[in-house]
């Protein structure tokens, strides 16, 4: 049975393949130029003439545009700096932290300045109060020293007034009457703290060793036997030679009393002086008694 597929002319698809005008295009044949096309350029590829082209566009990096992002004419390097000089892109949290930190530092600096100014004011007030207190203490000390000096001079006058009469009593008055309290090392008890004597003697490096008083005894003995001139008693008055023997007896009694005082004081030269003064008085009484 015959079908449409059996006949070569039954369908348009069965027409010859070369009948299409598009398929019959020959690449070697020159292409027809349209009437409105530009003439071909005689310049080869990558050739730029000295004269500018009337149809060309100006360069982006030229002076015809005021582009702030354009590179300068004489710059041949990269537009961006090197990567090691470019900072890392900071995030929002880091920028916010830097802002808060700057605010905190500013507040802290402000507080420090206020505190410093307050300290300076307090120091000025303290110095002013210290100077005033110092002046008051100096004036008080001057008054106290004047009173103490007056008392000391009065005591010295009193001491020298009676020192020539009983100088051993004067020496005993020079020694303080307070009993020295020996303070031991270590912890103090409450009872010891309550007692506050006038003189406190702290034990030396050798506890239990008695104080050497030999030098003090030597000085006292030297003062006893050879007293200084201001502590020597005045010489007794000379016995008045009278016609009656009463004056002679009185002179002998005065000489005997002086010798007794001298012996009581313990001064050997004074005893000799008293004996020498009593001898003429006794010699003067003997002729009167014989007569």
UniProtKB/Swiss-Prot annotation:
Keyword annotations from UniProtKB, A to Z: Coated pit, Coiled coil, Cytoplasmic vesicle, Membrane
GO biological process: clathrin-dependent endocytosis; intracellular protein transport
Keyword match Membrane: yes
Claim: rRNA-binding is one of the keywords in the record: no
Region (Disordered): 1-91, 183-291
Topological category with respect to the lipid bilayer: Peripheral membrane protein
Low complexity bias: start-end ranges: 253-267, 274-291
GO MF assignments: clathrin heavy chain binding; structural molecule activity
Region (Involved in binding clathrin heavy chain): 84-146
InterPro entries: Clathrin_L-chain
Family designation: Belongs to the clathrin light chain family.
Name this protein carries in UniProt: Clathrin light chain 2
Organism: Oryza sativa subsp. japonica
């Amino acid at each position: 049975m015959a079908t449409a597929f059996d006949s070569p002319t039954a369908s348009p698809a069965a027409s010859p393949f070369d009948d299409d005008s598009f398929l019959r295009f020959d690449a070697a044949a020159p292409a027809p130029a349209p009437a409105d096309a530009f003439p071909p350029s005689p310049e080869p590829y990558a050739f730029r003439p000295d004269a500018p082209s009337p149809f060309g566009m100006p360069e982006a990096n030229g002076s015809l545009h005021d582009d702030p992002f354009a590179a300068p004419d004489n710059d041949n390097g990269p537009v961006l700096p090197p990567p090691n000089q470019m900072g890392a892109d900071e995030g929002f949290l880091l920028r916010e932290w830097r802002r808060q930190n700057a605010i905190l530092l500013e507040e802290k600096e402000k507080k420090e300045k206020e505190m410093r100014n307050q300290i300076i004011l307090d120091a000025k007030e303290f110095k002013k109060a210290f100077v005033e207190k110092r002046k008051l203490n100096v004036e008080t000390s001057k008054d106290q020293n004047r009173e103490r000096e007056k008392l000391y001079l009065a005591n010295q006058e009193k001491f020298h007034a009676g020192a020539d009469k009983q100088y051993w009593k004067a020496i005993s008055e020079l020694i303080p009457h307070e009993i020295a309290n020996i303070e031991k090392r270590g912890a103090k008890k409450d009872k010891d703290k309550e007692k506050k004597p006038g003189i406190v003697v702290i034990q030396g490096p050798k506890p239990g060793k008695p104080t050497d008083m030999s030098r003090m005894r030597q000085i006292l003995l030297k003062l006893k036997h050879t007293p200084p001139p201001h502590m020597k008693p005045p010489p007794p008055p000379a016995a008045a030679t009278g016609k009656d023997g009463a004056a002679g007896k009185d002179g002998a009694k005065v000489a005997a009393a002086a010798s007794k005082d001298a012996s009581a004081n313990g001064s050997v030269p004074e005893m000799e002086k008293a004996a020498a003064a009593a001898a003429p008085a006794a010699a003067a009484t003997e002729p009167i008694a014989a007569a």
